[in-house]
């Protein structure tokens, strides 16, 4: 792996430095320099000197910002997404045709060479209107204004007049729905007001920034698209917001609003998995390190866009961990390694002093390990505890303990919320498909694991079995299996009879009986059902139901082994730990004390989190 994730920030510390940046930007503009000079001349005659400073800020930081030029391929992908948004499904061949589209080869139109004076002036004037006229912005200083309200773009989208369009479309919210002065409450009012038209989650394609005008009409995409939409909307009505993210494995983004208290409060405007802004609370995801997209900061790539700053301390406060580095790795910088499944993802780089490295501002309760530039483990794994102390995880082979394990990775709040959609679901039988007198077979309890069982008390044979989620919960069912015996040795073969319409092309009803516990059937919002045909009347004595899940619980028949990290010597297998699962909980003995562990599935999958033994069970870090 080539480690290129060097995230940092620079600050302009003098007027001469800002002047040099401005001169450099004007020189880089080439034939477009007159447009930028026109902006500066316009504001030199404006009595509000802040506007000239804002113009200088935007122009000074403009180098490296660009929009990707639309292409026939990108237009085709956007057309497929628009159809998915409008009709919820699209021809699978058409979907597959564009699934492998990549935006990497799209041409770039650099702002410094193409932006017009009229566009920039209109953007600056509208941003200042919102700074000066919105009561919740009285606390904003100039630097916060420049990053949270002023920017004319959010990514690599084409330049367009999104601010005017969004203000006209959504100003009714601040005109009549919410007229207070609390930005957090305003964000939640927007969330509640437009929730029925919020984002439909779709990550079928690799996408560049799609632009505010397209997202206004087509609210579909992944977390980045929903965050872009939220920034366009909220900045257009004067709310100071930004986009935060983490970089490990699958990158996730969300939004933050600057409260009048000076705190940044997280939220995410997604219809089903989103979250309102709640002071002092985030979404519970493990972050490790957190970064914020800024217009005027140095970036991770050669052309300095997109640009990120480290804001981890906004979430967890300041802290530091000082750890010893092996002699072989002291010749250069070392990286903060984040455990992402079987890889170590570098988060930030520090220099080694007196044989030690000090990593600042990291999430407490999360395991890290120092690594060299070529990915070599450079020291012992560690974490910061709740008191701010650094805890080293060095295996004690002279002291062993017993341990149980029921998962490969930590259970996230999203996972539990998804599984809970099965809680209270009603399972009924009937001799006919219209269920005139349904036979109660059971009700699903609150799922804590993947495999769940119901043993019907009814002795009446049935030919059809119906699964109905409890309203207002939605259908999210991984598997439904029926048995003639309580020991689950005699499976009843079933076929689909009828079902409510699926919500997505890849979440069809057949997934609930395909034998693959990672696929699932997802119904549309509102009442839904699934009816299975047993072919003939049968006595159903056991029902196995599997909620939609991440397939990281213990899986019957898979072979596992327990491993521990022995510092720079790498991962080692706990002696005698290899076992084939016959239950949903695995039991191990002879586990080294104080060790960082992982449960390795030798049969399938790559998602394996790290944990320690606590009270005989797993505590994921």
What are these regions (language model features)?
Residues 37-38, 46-218:
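Secondary-structure boundary elements
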Residues 332-351, 426-443, 550, 556, ...:
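Short amphipathic beta-strand segments in non-cytosolic proteins
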Residues 356-367, 373-375, 459-461, 590-593:
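Short Pro-Gly-centered beta-turn/loop motif in secreted/extracellular proteins
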Residues 318-328, 411-412:
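A short, amphipathic beta-strand motif
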Residues 374-400, 482, 609-621:
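Structured interaction patches on ligand/partner-binding surfaces of diverse proteins
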């Amino acid at each position: 792996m080539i480690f290129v994730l060097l995230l940092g920030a620079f600050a302009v510390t003098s007027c001469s430095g800002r002047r040099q940046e401005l001169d450099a930007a004007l020189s880089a503009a080439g034939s477009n320099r007159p447009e930028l000079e026109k902006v500066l001349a316009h504001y030199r005659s404006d009595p509000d000197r802040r506007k000239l400073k804002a113009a200088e800020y935007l122009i000074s930081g403009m180098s490296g910002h660009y929009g990707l030029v639309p292409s026939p391929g990108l237009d085709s992908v956007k057309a497929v997404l628009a159809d998915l948004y409008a009709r919820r499904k699209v021809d699978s061949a058409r979907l597959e045709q564009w699934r492998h589209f990549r935006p990497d080869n799209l041409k770039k139109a650099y702002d410094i060479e193409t932006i017009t004076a009229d566009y920039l002036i209109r953007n600056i004037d509208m941003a200042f209107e919102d700074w000066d006229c919105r009561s919740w912005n009285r606390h904003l200083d100039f630097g916060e204004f420049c990053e949270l309200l002023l920017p004319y773009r959010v990514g690599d989208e084409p330049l367009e007049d999104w601010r005017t369009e969004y203000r006209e479309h959504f100003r009714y919210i601040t005109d009549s729905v919410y007229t207070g002065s609390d930005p957090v409450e305003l964000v939640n009012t927007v969330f509640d007001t437009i929730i029925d038209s919020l984002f439909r989650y779709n990550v079928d394609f690799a996408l560049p920034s799609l632009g505010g005008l397209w997202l206004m009409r087509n609210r579909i995409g992944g977390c980045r698209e929903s965050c872009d939409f939220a920034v366009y909307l909220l900045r257009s009505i004067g709310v100071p917001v930004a986009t935060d993210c983490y970089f490990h494995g699958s990158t996730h983004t969300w939004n933050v609003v600057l409260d009048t208290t000076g705190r940044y409060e997280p939220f995410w405007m997604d219809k089903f998995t989103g979250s309102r802004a709640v002071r002092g609370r985030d979404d519970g995801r493990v972050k490790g390190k957190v970064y914020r997209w800024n217009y005027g900061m140095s970036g991770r790539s050669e052309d300095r866009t997109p640009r990120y700053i480290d804001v981890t301390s906004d979430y967890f406060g300041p802290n530091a961990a000082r750890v010893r580095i092996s002699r072989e790795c002291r010749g250069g910088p070392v990286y903060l390694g984040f455990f992402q499944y079987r890889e170590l993802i570098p988060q930030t780089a520090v220099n080694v002093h007196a044989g030690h490295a000090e990593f600042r501002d990291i999430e407490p309760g999360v395991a890290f390990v120092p690594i060299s530039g070529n990915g070599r483990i450079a020291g012992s794994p560690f974490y910061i505890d709740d008191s701010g102390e650094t805890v080293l995880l060095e295996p004690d082979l002279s002291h062993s303990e017993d341990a149980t394990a029921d998962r490969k990775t930590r259970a996230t709040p999203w996972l539990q919320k998804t599984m809970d959609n099965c809680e209270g679901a009603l399972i009924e039988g009937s001799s006919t498909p219209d269920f005139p007198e349904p036979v109660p077979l059971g009700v699903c309890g609150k799922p804590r694991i993947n495999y769940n069982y119901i043993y019907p008390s009814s002795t009446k044979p049935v030919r059809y079995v119906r699964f109905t989620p409890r309203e207002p919960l939605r259908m999210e069912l991984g598997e439904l299996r029926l048995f003639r015996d309580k020991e689950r040795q005699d499976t009843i073969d079933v076929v689909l009879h009828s079902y409510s319409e699926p919500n997505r092309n890849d979440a069809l009803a057949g997934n609930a009986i395909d034998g693959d516990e990672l696929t699932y059937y997802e119904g549309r919002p509102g009442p839904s059902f699934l009816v299975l045909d047993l072919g003939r009347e049968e006595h159903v004595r056991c029902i196995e139901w599997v909620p939609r899940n991440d397939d990281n619980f213990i899986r019957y028949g898979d072979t596992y082994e327990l491993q521990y990290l022995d510092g720079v010597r790498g991962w080692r297998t706990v002696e005698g730990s290899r076992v084939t699962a016959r239950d949903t909980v695995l039991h191990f003995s002879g586990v080294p004390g104080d060790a960082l562990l992982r449960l390795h599935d030798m049969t399938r999958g790559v998602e394996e989190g790290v944990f320690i033994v606590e009270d005989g069970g797993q505590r994921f870090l």
